[in-house]
Amino acid sequence: LRVATTSLAGCFGCHMAILDIDERLLDLLQLVEFDRSPITDIKHCGPCDIGIIEGGLCNAENVHVLREFRANCKILIAIGACAINGGLPAQRNHLSLSTILEEVYHAQHGLVDGFIPNDPELPLPLDKVHPIHEVVKVDYFIPGCPPSGDAIWKVLTDLISGREPELGHGLIHYD
């Protein structure tokens, strides 16, 4: 089985939680081949069986990466609060984008001639932060901020074994 991971708008804590599988990660590496992930440093995802994605959608580049990633994954797992409901980045959703940009680039004390960047190399921010299921089909959700390594291990080993993943209450928590 091929597994790929990627991160959108978030803190990368969910990828750190994957490392919390600890020595079981070595067992996992005997069962799967990692494609795109920080473990392999592969930047583009090829066809894979299981895709794991963390982070919400804050800008146009996030949406592009998500759609491309989903197109290459037979099964997509949303991992963590940011991917599932927007998480901390979605705290900005009660303000308009123009208000946020004005506050950051013009209203801060000490700014001289502040301007809002308008460079084609920068991804366009979205008006609101969105969870990934609003844009693509998600097959499984692993909640938490971050989810526990045990929850990630349980879902992955269930899928690898052909079982439907089931997380008990003891595996779902927010730290």
Give the location of each predicted region:
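Iron-sulfur-associated redox domains of electron-transfer enzymes in respiratory
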Residues: 1-175
